[in-house]
Amino acid sequence: TIRNYFLKYPLKVRQQVRFITMDMSGAYMPLARRLFPNAEIIIDRFHIIQHLGRAFLKTRIAIMNQFDKKSLPYRALKNHWRLFQKDSRKLSLNPFYSKTFHQTLCPHEVVEKTLNFSEELANYYNLYQLLLFHFQEKRGDEFFELIEENISKVNHYFKTVFRTFRKHKQYIKNALETHYSNAKLEGTNKLIKDIKRLGFGFRNFINF
């Protein structure tokens, strides 16, 4: 087990560990605190953004399903979903032809047109983007103030995420105050998954 692996190291050595980056898995946090009593726990930034993204994704789908499947709002929300997940500041400025709207538009114009179909979606989109902004700019106080202001008003998708963030508030603030992350490790894991997917189950590419 992970516990037994790290217990191979003397307590004196483990006490020298200053930082640990991890996801929000409840099982590992108590273990990390026991094994490395002097370390600050840092929630990996990727996982924080991922939680917010999933909450908005589920919200968009729920609102999308309120429309007829043949309607323009439904098709716009379904076909251009990736644009809504992005940080709005990173949307491309290059126009493209939208088969959904039958016209050439910039990504931000597609987003604006689609948000006009639903005030509820527009409100959640603005909340999501503001949370991303505060997080990316490392404004921890503003990030959590926004959560506190909205936790009683949001749907259960966002409420669940907000409660999780509340629970790990200090660890998330640590993520905003330090430069540590699991980015390289996550990138390696993704590469391994991609290789396995492309391998179609073959264990040895020589036998392919």
What does each model-found stretch correspond to?
Residues 3-42, 46-50, 69-208:
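Acidic/histidine-rich catalytic cores and adjacent linkers
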Residues 48-69:
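Short alpha-helix plus adjacent loop in nuclease-associated cores
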